[in-house]
């Protein structure tokens, strides 16, 4: 009896590339989760920062923060300007140039946002050093906005005559001066212009020139030319007064984003600039109103400094109605500053619509603005799209790997080593198996073919 050993090949081990597929799959999952967490943290960081700032205001001096709302204009603007509210009893913000840094200018640019209901008051006044007499004043007279300035001879006045501005709405006024020429514009209304008619001194000199001895003509002419040059320069500017209290013409309402020849005076006041003094009924938006009958200190404490927001700030307008005051919140931006810095008149302005906002409690996160909602929604959309794309890619790779694994070669074979094993093995009774001598050639071939087995 022949003992046949059929050896079946062991199943092949899993190829190394399948391990790579699984590594790639888990790598995709981990990377998608990591990227989504980064996007979520980046989108939530501005909100958390603003929440921390509001909590700081509440815990520092227990003020009621004003909700910040962003307008389409503020989305285009750069940095926002600070807003101050001037009460009924009047107030004053006074900026004084250092004695060794007082400018003399041939041209000036002034811009400010305001809202008020008073018929008369001084918004801003710039004065030269004592004894010179040069000044520039922005004021409201009979409900209409105007500017009067004097740079050495007579007062030059320019005014918006068409429409009153004491309607309680928010307006932006811009004034430019170049020598004796001046322009004044309110919002996007038509521009008011002023051009001097001529040099009166030169005209008079030409009339009496022939009566003056010849040897005196040259010195007098040079003196008149030098005087004419001086009449175009605002000499040795010393201080900027905001609010009109020092002149007895009190302004009541709100002022925002004041810009004058590169100085953002209200921002400097909010940042506790040492050259600025504040007294009277003046309150920075976001602070606790002072007790009636008391005045603020002449210098601002550090607690009154405000955080300059990215694009916009809110402004509150106070309107006294039978001992009751209501505040309306309106958005603004530094578009008025940028328009004051450039001389082009083709800039567009969006009319500020008054809107009311309920103040939030200290430490409570403010309502997000339109730009924040857009930024958060776009971040969420990007995160979802990234996760879905990564998951789809991983699923496709996994399906392809499973397909290749199922269609691999599953063939097997068996090996018959009967002849070799029998010739070398012992019988069960201990005797060796003796092969029979081949009887014939045909019988040997038959036996050989009989012992062979083939498997496919």
Curated annotation (Swiss-Prot):
Parts of the chain that traverse the membrane: 382-402
GO biological process: angiogenesis; cell adhesion
Glycosylation: residue positions: 181, 279, 323, 339
Extracellular side: 36-381
GO molecular function terms attached to this record: metal ion binding
Maturation and modification: Processed by alpha-secretase leading to the formation of an extracellular soluble protein as well as a C-terminal membrane-embedded fragment (CTF). Proteolysis of these CTFs by gamma-secretase releases intracellular domains (ICDs) and extracellular peptides.
Alphabetically ordered keywords of this record: Angiogenesis, Calcium, Cell adhesion, Cell membrane, Cell projection, Glycoprotein, Heparan sulfate, Membrane, Metal-binding, Proteoglycan, Repeat, Secreted, Signal, Synapse, Transmembrane, Transmembrane helix
SMART domains to which the protein is assigned, alphabetical: 4.1m, LamG
Pfam families: Laminin_G_2 (PF02210), Syndecan (PF01034)
UniProt-annotated stretches for the region Disordered: 41-63, 316-340, 424-456
This protein's GO CC annotations: cell projection; extracellular region; plasma membrane; presynaptic membrane
Record's compositionally biased regions (Basic residues): 52-63
InterPro entries: ConA-like_dom_sf, Laminin_G, Neurexin-like, Neurexin-related_CASP, Syndecan/Neurexin_dom
All copies of domain Laminin G-like, residue ranges: 82-282
Segments of skewed composition (Polar residues): 325-340
Membrane-side (Cytoplasmic) residue stretches: 403-456
Protein residues bound to Ca(2+): 134, 151, 233, 235
Residues in the signal sequence: 1-35
CDD domains, A to Z: LamG
Domain of life: Eukaryota
Assigned protein family: Belongs to the neurexin family.
Role, per record: Neuronal cell surface protein that may be involved in cell recognition and cell adhesion. May mediate intracellular signaling. Functions as part of a trans-synaptic complex by binding to cerebellins and postsynaptic GRID1. This interaction helps regulate the activity of NMDA and AMPA receptors at hippocampal synapses without affecting synapse formation. NRXN3B-CBLN2-GRID1 complex transduce presynaptic signals into postsynaptic AMPAR response.
Name of the molecule in the record: Neurexin-3-beta
Organism phylogeny: Eukaryota, Metazoa, Chordata, Craniata, Vertebrata
């Amino acid at each position: 009896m022949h003992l046949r050993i059929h050896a079946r090949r062991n199943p092949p081990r899993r190829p190394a590339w399948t391990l790579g597929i699984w590594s790639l799959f888990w790598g995709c999952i981990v990377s998608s989760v990591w990227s989504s967490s980064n996007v979520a943290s980046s989108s939530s960081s501005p909100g958390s920062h603003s929440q921390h700032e509001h909590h700081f205001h509440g815990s520092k001096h227990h003020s009621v923060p004003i909700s910040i709302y962003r307008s389409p204009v503020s989305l285009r603007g750069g940095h926002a300007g600070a807003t101050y509210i001037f009460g009924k009893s009047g107030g004053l913000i006074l900026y004084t140039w250092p004695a060794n840094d007082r400018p003399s200018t041939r041209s000036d640019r002034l811009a400010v946002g305001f809202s008020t209901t008073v018929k008369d008051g001084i918004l801003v006044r710039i004065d030269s050093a004592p004894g010179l007499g040069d000044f520039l004043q922005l004021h409201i007279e009979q409900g209409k906005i105007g500017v009067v300035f004097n740079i050495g001879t007579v007062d030059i006045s320019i005014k918006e005559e068409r429409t009153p501005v004491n309607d309680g709405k928010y307006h932006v006024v811009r004034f430019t001066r170049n020598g004796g020429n001046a322009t004044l514009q309110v919002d996007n209304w038509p521009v008011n212009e002023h051009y001097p008619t001529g040099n009166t001194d030169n005209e008079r000199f030409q009339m009496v020139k022939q009566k003056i001895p010849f040897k005196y003509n040259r010195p007098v002419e040079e003196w008149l030319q030098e005087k004419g040059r001086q009449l175009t320069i605002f000499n040795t500017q010393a201080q900027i007064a905001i609010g009109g209290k020092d002149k007895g013409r009190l302004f009541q309402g709100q002022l925002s984003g004041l810009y004058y020849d590169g100085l953002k005076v209200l921002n400097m006041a909010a940042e506790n600039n040492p050259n600025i003094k504040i007294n009277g009924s003046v309150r920075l938006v976001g602070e606790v109103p002072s007790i009636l009958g008391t005045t603020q200190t002449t210098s601002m404490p550090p607690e009154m400094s405000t955080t300059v927001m990215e694009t916009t700030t809110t402004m509150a307008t106070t309107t006294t109605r039978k001992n009751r005051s209501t505040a309306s919140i309106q958005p603004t931006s530094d578009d008025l500053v940028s328009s004051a810095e450039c001389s082009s008149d083709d800039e567009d302005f969006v009319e500020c619509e008054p809107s009311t906002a309920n103040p939030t409690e200290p430490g409570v996160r403010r309502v997000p603005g339109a730009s924040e909602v857009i930024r958060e929604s776009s971040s969420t959309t990007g995160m979802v799209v990234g996760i879905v794309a990564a998951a789809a890619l991983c699923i496709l790779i996994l399906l392809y790997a499973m397909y290749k694994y199922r269609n691999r070669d599953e063939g097997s074979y068996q090996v018959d080593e009967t002849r070799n094993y029998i010739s070398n093995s012992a019988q069960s009774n201990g005797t060796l198996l003796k092969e029979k001598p081949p009887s014939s050639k045909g019988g040997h071939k038959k036996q050989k073919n009989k012992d062979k087995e083939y498997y496919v």
